[in-house]
């Protein structure tokens, strides 16, 4: 707790002390908080990075956060229902991706089955853009193994002075889904304030065979953001956000969510142009708390046992960074950051039936879920960018000091690992890259990154819970080594003007990763199943490190812009993983995907037809219960127009041909009386409408 308080005092003291710096009172510009990616600035942009930034312009359908990733090449989603959806990029998922809001704010899920991933704690319509760093190619934003995802909310400082607002409403026919949001903003020379509130109500959807898939949920979100210009070159911003999920069905998990409440608070500070050499100081502090309750009250096994699991997660973190400029061509970033996680929770089981017979007096048992676990990471880093002629070199080094512990162990867990499971690590990450302008319209990027990920809490401390995509109970291992990703990548991007009306652009990337100490799980026949021991599988999986694994793949995009406003585009992504120790792929390896889009993009209207091709996936991990999945093809059509000056209407038909299909990454139906253990099917044909009014 002392460390938590110290982090907040550090941020506050920096803000107060630098606010005393004498500044010119004439406000010629407004200082803005830094973003991970500043598009077009090769001096500061991370190598192999991209940005998707048309969410605010073309809100043409109601969506959950997963939809925000659907058009970014290389992304897929892991689906357990219509709510608990995780992004995956190049076969990296969960903590292998460094997912954040606004450059560093994080909220860690409380549920061991990830019913409440980080992407559920923000209003999707609030996101202005998503920034992606495609590998461990920067050390400035925390420990990064497979890449960075930064979801950026709207910056009020980019608006004109005065009062602004927008109201939006959307509807989907498949699932009778309704979404609403209201946002109000005021911007002046000295301060800005933004408030928003959103409500979402989704019912069960139907797949292409008109089978009803349990997937309903409701959520209410609100947020308040306040920014203040201390001087012309200093800016401070506070952000308060709360989300309340209710009655959430998870068709691919053994339980459902009764409620999921989260609170996220952040404080950001930035000072610019402090001296000729010291160009800036940024500081961030954040706090998040997730309160989650899951039960099996509406599940098939409720008559045999009632299970109720209240769990909590607390995350406290911060960052302090200085930006130095030497000789006008060397940018140096030096700083420190922290990410402190605590989790706890207990499952209470009321056993009503044993050996097929109803008990006259039900038995009550309690199981420790997180065993009062903590995982603290304090990092220090330095990253330099050196520009000479047409080439920018980047080199970075990072040290992470990790401490993990669980203080309330179950007896059987302690009998295996002892009563003291506290572990400490010092992890070294690094990157080296270059970005070269071959010509005025062609860029080459070459990069190496060494990303290190410490084992997460489930991998360390979970005790006989089914937390994977298979039916095994999993046992944590506090002795796990951190996994290492040595990733190499080369990429080209460019554009050319074919004539006065037509243009061509392209991107191509190829990557290869060598994994050391990759964290997986193996069946241990000496450890039997703990709960319901008569069921299969009979034994327990234990998390372990494997010696020999790799990942390779490529991504390709080309786009023809025709007659200025029309376009044809293709995006394709392929990734192949291999676990040589097991003689199979790593789990959750997405299949080859390719999309073909044709559309028009004019100032007052736009339209797009997109053909989505997903291949059969035969590169699977049978030891994790994976089976081959068939390929499929779908067609989406989206239209939008500005009806009046401030009113936008978007309509769409998704899955036009009402296909029945399952993505390879979807979990299988679990604890459902009317479904076998087959992968969750996706929604069938779906008509959507989205209306937005800006003022």
Where are these regions (language model features)?
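Outer membrane beta-barrel strand-and-loop segments of large Gram-negative receptors
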Residues: 223-225, 309-322, 375-379, 475-481, ...
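C-terminal beta-signal and adjacent terminal beta-strands/loops
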Residues: 452, 516-517, 521, 568, ...
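N-terminal periplasmic accessory domains that precede
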Residues: 35, 65-68, 85-88, 97-100, ...
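Transmembrane beta-barrel wall of Gram-negative outer-membrane proteins
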Residues: 173-201, 210-246, 257-273, 326-330, ...
